[in-house]
From Swiss-Prot:
This protein's encoding gene: ccsA
Purpose of the protein: Required during biogenesis of c-type cytochromes (cytochrome c6 and cytochrome f) at the step of heme attachment.
PANTHER family, A to Z: CYTOCHROME B_B6 PROTEIN-RELATED (PTHR30071:SF1), HEME EXPORTER PROTEIN C (PTHR30071)
Subunit field text: May interact with Ccs1.
Protein name: Cytochrome c biogenesis protein CcsA
Organism, as annotated: Cyanophora paradoxa
A single Gene Ontology CC term: plasma membrane
Single GO molecular function: heme binding
Length: 322
């Protein structure tokens, strides 16, 4: 069996594992089956190992760390996202909406690599002189790990905002005006919501079904804190990655910063999360306002990583679309 065949097998296997798991995670959300939880975790672990083996295979074959092109770096990002999810799951940080979102995201990413990315962009090729540096591993790997961490943290903020929306909707339906004072809003109420009070406010079947969502609403504060912790971990990595890239650029091209589109968007990404941490730590923001800033970061990362790269402009581009 040659390397190309092995790579294709691992790639195809990983995609179908993620594809099946996406449906099973949604089934788990509906049927609340403990067996499905165990199966889904095992499936994510198997897919993680499969991608790890794919990266190791390319590393051995090429002779350099496999993050030199879009195919390799995106698989490294997928592996990072999967690894962070496994870590959270094993540490009892289990959130159904996060499970569904991550599995769907991983399926789309691997599907893009398997079905859409041109074959020539998957091939192992010799490094250009500028990439023959130890800074390649340092810069790109740290950036990818920071992206994975910040993506999960931002995704948790998006889920948190969805919970806030559900709380507002739920309170309107059960007419829980008596629980709110004139100076309260849904953002402060979400931390102080009384399950028993809401349960006693309505006896109808419709409201009883709605009140089942309170078990998820109770996770909201945990979501907010977990998002903050992940972003706090990912932000220094992003900073280190950008600095490493600047040092590498100076060695390769004689300039620390050239305002390449990738560099510009990396700075924008850094500023978004710097603003989030500043408002959270210095200004004391919590809840909705801080989560909105973090949620914006999720989309900014994708523009920085994929959007700019695929436009075919600048030294970081892969030159596919234009």
């Amino acid at each position: 069996m040659n390397i190309s065949t092995l790579q294709l097998i691992l790639e195809t296997f990983s995609f179908f594992i993620y594809f099946i798991l996406t449906f099973l995670f949604f089934a788990q959300a509906i049927f609340k089956n403990h067996w499905l939880k165990t199966f889904n975790f095992s499936g994510m672990l198997i897919a993680n190992v499969s991608i790890f083996l794919l990266l190791i295979t390319r590393w051995i074959t090429a002779g350099y760390f496999p993050i030199s092109n879009l195919y390799e770096s995106l698989f490294f990002l997928v592996w990072g996202l999967n690894t962070i999810w496994l870590f959270l799951y094993k540490n009892n940080m289990r959130i159904q909406l996060l499970d569904n979102s991550v599995s769907l995201l991983l399926t789309l990413l691997v599907g893009f690599l398997h079905f859409i990315l041109p074959q020539e962009m998957r091939e192992i090729s010799p490094l250009v002189p500028a990439l023959k540096s130890n800074w390649l591993m340092m810069h790109v790997s740290v950036m990818m790990i920071s992206y994975a961490t910040l993506m999960i943290g931002s995704l948790l903020s998006i889920i948190y905002l969805y919970f806030l929306y559900r709380v507002d909707k739920l309170l309107n339906k059960i007419n829980a005006v008596n629980l709110m004072t004139s100076n309260q809003n849904s953002n402060s109420l979400i931390y102080n919501l009384s399950f028993n009070t809401l349960l006693n406010s309505s006896k109808s079947m419709e409201y009883q079904i709605l009140l089942k969502d309170l078990s998820l609403i109770k996770l909201s504060k945990r979501l907010d804190n977990l998002s903050y912790r992940l972003i706090t971990f990912g932000f220094p990595l992003l900073t280190i990655g950008i600095i490493a890239g600047a040092v590498w650029a100076n060695e390769a091209w004689g300039s620390y910063w050239s305002w390449d589109p990738k560099e510009t968007w990396a700075l924008i990404t850094w500023l978004i999360f710097a603003i989030y941490l500043h408002t959270r730590i210095i200004k004391g923001w919590q809840g909705k306002k801080a989560a909105m800033v973090a949620s914006l970061g999720f989309f900014i990362i994708w523009i920085c990583y994929l959007g700019v790269n695929l436009l075919g402009k600048g030294i970081h581009s892969y030159g596919w679309f234009f």
